[in-house]
Design a protein with these regions (language model features):
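Cap/insert and terminal regions of metallo-dependent hydrolase folds
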Residues: 1-12, 134, 203-297
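Active-site neighborhood of phospho(di)ester-bond hydrolases with catalytic His/Asp-centered motifs
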Residues: 71-73, 101-115, 130-134, 193-198, ...
């Protein structure tokens, strides 16, 4: 896979200190038999209710109903990964007012393109957060450190009703060693599943007949191979091409597995805006939304480049439009970085 070489004899990758857990198995009549539990996690919901899904930025979605509203993974302004990533989408007009008006915020994991301190500083301190109950508490600890204490830690695969509303939700763990998660919720007979950018979500045990499936799609998130001088340009191109194809194949499999009526590509709208990263920007080719126009026959693509707000009545999409947006940061990335990092300088003497 994209990690590199896996040595099945010892159950470890050769290039990173990661092991895979051995499956329980039996040998019956010289056949290797592995038993899988394929129970489908399903939340109830029968009523035909209206719900609106709005793309705000990168992995940040706004979900609105007559009873409750929330956003996911707020990164709207500022940079991520030590200024390596910048938002590709201009911020929505009055975005801080929009964000502060919701009932709660779901944060999938603590990477800075999902839990972003530049964005969080604009959010009211009494905001409610629903976060995964990771053993390390990696999300909740960071929120508490930055002044947020209204935190509900959802245990994986437990189902929750939000107060007295029709919103039912559960959080799935990624199927690997990382602190990562995805979100599944229903509102009436509208259902939503997002893998965000996690690997092997819930060990691929998906609910089926999903109304809207959302996931990352772009790739280009790793410093490997472009930032490695030990890899020649030809090999870099091969690795990047392989990774993009692998991501496309995974997305298609997940769409098929979920039986989704609609697919929303998101969590991939970032760019390398700093002048020092021009070479990365020019060579770090990513998948585009348009690369997913040829989907499973029963699934329709929601193209954020065309419309970013979608209106559903139950499982039926009945309208779409564009929201107003401000311009991107007036200040250049270099000015922003200078202001941020000027107090972080150190002397080599």
């Amino acid at each position: 896979p994209m990690h590199g070489t896996f040595d099945a004899r010892v159950g470890k990758y050769t290039n990173i200190e990661v092991s895979k857990k051995e499956l329980d198995y039996e040998i019956i009549d010289d056949n290797l038999v592995v038993n899988f539990n394929h129970d489908e996690p399903t939340l109830p919901g029968q009523k035909k209710l209206e719900i609106t899904i709005t793309y705000l930025s990168h992995a940040c979605l706004l979900i609105e109903t007559n009873e409750v509203s929330f956003i996911t993974d707020p990164w709207i302004v500022g940079f991520a990964f030590a200024s390596g990533w910048w938002p590709k989408s201009p911020p929505p007009k009055d975005w801080s007012k929009i964000v502060n008006s919701v009932d709660f915020i779901y944060i999938s994991h603590n990477h800075p393109d999902h839990l972003n301190l530049f964005t969080l500083k604009y959010i009211r301190e009494d905001m409610e957060y629903i976060v995964p109950d990771f053993e390390s508490q990696s999300v909740s600890r960071m929120l508490i450190k930055n002044g947020f204490n209204n935190i509900f830690k959802a245990q994986f695969q437990n189902y929750y009703r939000y107060k007295n509303t029709e919103l039912l939700l559960t959080i799935f763990k990624s199927g690997d060693f990382r602190d990562d998660s995805g979100l599944y919720f229903t509102y009436g007979n509208f259902s939503f599943l997002s893998t965000v950018d996690s690997n092997n979500l819930n060990f691929q045990k998906f609910p089926t007949d999903i109304t809207l499936f959302a996931s990352s799609f772009a790739g280009g998130a790793s410093g490997y191979p472009l930032c490695f001088e030990t890899v020649n340009s030809t090999e870099k191109t091969k690795v990047l091409d392989r990774n993009r194809k692998a991501i496309k194949a995974t997305v298609r499999q997940n769409i098929q597995r979920s039986g989704a009526k609609f697919f929303l590509p998101y969590a991939g709208f970032f760019t390398e805006s700093a002048q020092r990263d021009l070479e990365i920007l020019q060579n770090n080719r990513k998948n585009t939304v348009e690369n997913f126009t040829d989907l499973v026959a029963s699934t329709s693509l929601l193209n954020i480049n065309e419309f970013d707000k979608y209106f559903f009545n139950g499982s039926n999409l009945f309208d779409y439009q564009n929201i107003q947006r401000d311009s991107l940061d007036v200040e250049s990335p270099e000015v922003i970085m200078e202001n941020v990092f000027q107090n972080c300088l150190f002397s080599e003497s």
